[in-house]
Amino acid sequence: MTSATIPGLNGTDGTPPTQHKELLAWVQEVAELTQPDRVVFADGSDEEWDRLTTKLVEAGTFTRLNDEKKPNSFLGNSDPSDVARVESRTYICSKEEIDAGPTNNWMDPAEMRTLMGDLYRGCMRGRTMYVVPFCMGPLDAEDPKLGVELTDSEYVVVSMRVMTRMGSKVLDKLGTDGFFVKALHSLGAPLADGQEDVAWPCNDTKYITHFPEDREIWSFGSGYGGNALLGKKCYSLRIASAMAHDEGWLAEHMLILKLISPEDKAYYIAAAFPSACGKTNLAMIQPTIPGWRAETLGDDIAWMRFGEDGQLYAVNPEFGFFGVAPGTNWSSNPNAMRTIDQGNTVFTNVALTDDGDVWWEGLEGDPQHLIDWKGNEWTPESGTHAAHPNSRYCTPMSQCPIMAPEWDDPKGVPISAILFGGRRKTTVPLVTEARDWQHGVFMGATVGSEQTAAAEGQVGTVRRDPMAMLPFLGYNVGDYFQHWIDLGKSADASKLPKVFYVNWFRRGDDGRFLWPGFGENSRVLKWIVERIEHKAAGIDTPIGVVPTGSALDIDGLDVSDADITEALAVNIDEWKAEIPLIEEWFDFVGEKLPTGIRDEFEALKQRLA
């Protein structure tokens, strides 16, 4: 099939909706390779949403939910083999292997292009190829970060409408020669003439590949989330982190929170936590201390750059939330529930109730019968998860009742504090303030979480996840640490955000949590704000500054003084045991570990001696 015979390649009326020569040439090249039945330029309209969601319902991919419960919302259940990001099949194909570094899978880019080119050949037969123009961050930014995803998945098109600024207005912004990231995606499930489709097409062979120097993403075989919605982790973190390194900014796996004091002063906080450490819950926190309020600007990704005034400003490049459903409820995260309840949401791999609503583990209610995420009848006696542990909601940010008005401001917001955190039962106190920027980078470089189940590795083993970026770095981790240090050195030290390390998950000897977490974490945020204002007391310890017992506002909190003391304790023996674990991690990072990080490590060892 030649390009001339592919319907839609030149628009519906023979005139392409863009005059961007490079884009049109790329669309034609990919269409000739993948051989779709037709090409459609996505416009992001309500009519398109209605048409594609109806098509997905008719295909059995989507179930339309009860409009009275979840208006304009849908449930999709994936193939059981396609339920999460696949780190083992995710590649950073830099020109030189050293530039991918020890934390990434690497293949020679020419070899990968040949391998994937063979997979792409004819892979869209029987399907429509959609051209999805999108923008990460506000479209009216000074330098908007544009992309175009080519995909044969309607699920991707409707999800990208929620997660990004997408459609005709982005094509207009591209003009005739604007730069864009090329993002190619296929389910890898061609259809022969007359072949019946399956509800969730995918391929056992999967690749999620990034070419950082070329700013390109190639994804094959998966229809799921971060593997297929290429604006999210692939562009906004892996490719953007490489762009940020080259251009002098930061692309980080961070929430952005606005905390407002009783005096009505706003503080903006960015925080990086690995998965299962409460990032979305903190992003949407309801403070429990009187007079304090919180608003959110994002729960997952922050792009940060220095403004003309020397302060570090952050924007959230996303347009929607792609949150983990299990554990989300009216107690743990009421604002997420209020966002979802307004509808316009795509759910994936949650359970379906008898009245056409959704349910997952941890949600209020005690259903006696459900259709589970695999499409099977489910009762409490089934002994299986009704919803997949990584099931998701994809919902517009604009629906969140506590979105800060400035969330869509291309200038961003000035960051006062950066938080790093992991899930540690021992060793790491509730909150520690770094001595300075470089010490803060050392803290971020050593973030880790204990493995929680034998299936994930030995229980208690610390999995390092530097700045919560381990799965998302687009280049060498050592160069990444150096980039953080360099940005700090080139900035006005008095205007740099203060850096803190938090750990909501410390446990007592009997295994119970010492700190209640959730909304009570606002008490820790209050201490952080008071440290920024030079008002709160702290104790200098070998690992940094921790609050005095009296400096933390625990008024009205039902936690014993002994538990607070233990949560804040710096146990020298535990930290001495941590040293060889950090050494092992730094050995893995290898020759590119910055001297500044090594200096901080040696200083810590001396303070512990």
Curated annotation (Swiss-Prot):
The gene is pckG. GO terms for cellular component: cytosol. SUPFAM superfamilies: PEP carboxykinase N-terminal domain, PEP carboxykinase-like. Its main location: cytoplasm. The keyword Metal-binding applies. The keyword Oxidoreductase does not apply. It is found in: Cytoplasm. GO terms for molecular function: GTP binding; manganese ion binding; phosphoenolpyruvate carboxykinase (GTP) activity. HAMAP family: PEPCK_GTP (MF_00452). It holds the Pfam family PEPCK_N. Keywords: Cytoplasm, Decarboxylase, Gluconeogenesis, GTP-binding, Lyase, Manganese, Metal-binding, Nucleotide-binding. It catalyses: oxaloacetate + GTP = phosphoenolpyruvate + GDP + CO2. It comes from Rhodococcus erythropolis (strain PR4 / NBRC 100887). Signal peptide: none annotated. This is Phosphoenolpyruvate carboxykinase [GTP]. The active site is at C277. Pathway: Carbohydrate biosynthesis; gluconeogenesis. InterPro entries: PEP_carboxykin_GTP_CS, PEP_carboxykinase_C, PEP_carboxykinase_GTP, PEP_carboxykinase_GTP_C, PEP_carboxykinase_GTP_N, PEP_carboxykinase_N. Its EC number is 4.1.1.32.
